[in-house]
Amino acid sequence: MNVLLSPQPPVFPHQHENHHLSPQRSLSPFHNMATRKRKADEDGDETMSPRSSPTISSRPLARPSKKIRANEVIGRPLALPRLLETLDTAQLRTVLERICERHPDIGHEVETGAPRPSVSSVVVVLQGYMEKLSNAVPYGETSPEYTYYRVKEPLVALIDALSDFTPQFLPPNETQPTKSLEFLNEATNIIHKLPDWEPQTYRHHKENAYEEISKAWALVINEAGKRAGGINLHSGGWDQILSRHNEQSGGRLAYAISAMTTSVGWLDPSTSSGPAGASDPNSILNQLMSGIMGLA
């Protein structure tokens, strides 16, 4: 059989394959699955990213602290030297006392390192107590009982201060008799100014103060009498000063008078000349030293 076929142009499959097939049909099932999986992974990564996380996005980011410039104005507490400048004596003493109470070793350093108190500085303190006592006295006519209980607290404070300060100026703590005698002179003058209560029961404060200061005088006089036979006591006019104090106290300085008589060997009865009496040419010691009594 002879069959004649009409010639036809050759057909290349790759030229018409994409033209006739839709995109959905051209993708294999495996390709679709891979596409969906990749998209899901991308969605998951986007969900876990810091930008999409609500927890991380709401957390404030830590910023570096701003460095304060040297010339920038900002509040700050005072330095210790400036703070101490603002404290008065009472405030500074209170702060120091509290520190020493909490730290006994610091208290010991203060005791050993502080300068020795002078007679004038202690007298100023005692005068402060005396001023408080004077301010506590009520105005007008009042009963002795009312007046006593009004001034009792500052009176006791003054007596206690005298008792505490006096041993500081007594031997052997104080080795200079002149300084001891200067303090006792000032302390005795303060005791003279204490009120004389009409009822005897209220006078025990002043009576006890006289007795204690008289014993202090006696101690200093006995120590001073060991030096140069007590000549310095008389040449400084202390025998006459003590005589005046004894007269003003109503004879309550018996211990001191006895010690002065023993140390010096005499006691000038003149009490009006005070310290200047030492230069009196008629004083007993000056007469002895000048030989007047020997020539008489």
From Swiss-Prot:
Residues 49-60 have a biased composition (Low complexity). The keyword Protein transport applies. One of its GO terms (molecular function) is proteasome binding. Keywords: Cytoplasm, Nucleus, Protein transport, Transport. InterPro entries: Cut8/Sts1_fam, Cut8/Sts1_sf. One of its GO terms (biological process) is nuclear protein quality control by the ubiquitin-proteasome system. Residues 1-64 are annotated as: Disordered. Its main location: cytoplasm. It comes from the Eukaryota. It is found in: Cytoplasm; Nucleus. GO terms for cellular component: cytoplasm; nuclear membrane. Binds the proteasome. Belongs to the cut8/STS1 family. PANTHER family: FI02826P (PTHR28032:SF1). This is Tethering factor for nuclear proteasome STS1. The lineage of its organism: Eukaryota, Fungi, Dikarya, Ascomycota, Pezizomycotina.
